[in-house]
Amino acid sequence: MAAAWPSGPSAPEAVTARLVGVLWFVSVTTGPWGAVATSAGGEESLKCEDLKVGQYICKDPKINDATQEPVNCTNYTAHVSCFPAPNITCKDSSGNETHFTGNEVGFFKPISCRNVNGYSYKVAVALSLFLGWLGADRFYLGYPALGLLKFCTVGFCGIGSLIDFILISMQIVGPSDGSSYIIDYYGTRLTRLSITNETFRKTQLYP
């Protein structure tokens, strides 16, 4: 009687074949071929906010004539419309992937603005120059005690008036409520710089 041929591989061979198949599948999906396939078919589109400088242009903010600050200034922040360059494809502020032609708004960029409360820089300087010896500048800025003291001492015999004029002109002394002066948006403003954790410090190179 002839021996029958085995109908399939033995148990060890079957386990080995399955293990090799699993390893091959993992190497294809996670290796360089899988990365190429993912980048070719499933690459996520870039957000418009992450575009590089030169790939978009932003409009100048609309300035309020009364406050000389952007009209939508809230919590020291305003937003301006930004337009991606033509032939740029990215996700807009609504999350929709869009191919831009240069005329569509892609995102709104936040810009810093100041809190003002009706105190004009020009008025403060004029009061300090002409009526500083009467304390009018201090009364205007919300310092009634110092204003009364200057009034009673004729501006500390003129010395206090001169010091106040310098401090107000340099925008060191401001309104008592902590707000900023109303100054022309594109005029001369004092910008205070501070060092934070994000400040880039360039190494000094000496010859």
Swiss-Prot record:
It is found in: Membrane. InterPro entries: TM2, TM2D1-3-like. It is a multi-pass membrane protein. Residues 1-37 form the signal peptide. The chain crosses the membrane at residues 129-149, 154-174. Glycans are attached at residues 72, 75, 87, 96, 197. This is TM2 domain-containing protein 1. It comes from Homo sapiens.
